Amino acid sequence: MQKKQADKRVFACINSTKIYTSDNGENDANNLVIGVLQRYRNRYILNAEELINALVKQKYTVKFLNFDVGCSLPTTAKLLEDVDVLISSHGNGIGDAIFMAPKTSVLSIDSRFYTEPWFTYVHTASGRRFYNFECVSSDCQVADI
């Protein structure tokens, strides 16, 4: 029974992941893979679609991730292994970036009226660059549900 539930989690996580590339086929192995981690309850990226379109227009490969479906740790690690830059709202999803390679970057969008430095310490100690974008405008803040 437990294996069956684990298999469902693996496939739900993989099936919810979408890869976006430019239509003209100019994306290649030398281009950065940018992961956009979206949450759907609290702290989600309000303009995720615009963000993805802008990145694809610049010829980046975008991996659109949704871990709210209940990803297992091995699946999460597999999905993040080729991500060069992870963009996510501040929260537990940022912690998943520990599965990214050293010398990669994490961009945390903090729209909660406060900031916590905990993730900064973990990622910089692991050899990743960590940037915190603190949104102070009500235009980009999402209320708790």
Question: Over which residues does each language-model region extend?
Answer:
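The feature primarily captures lumenal catalytic ectodomains
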Residues: 1-145
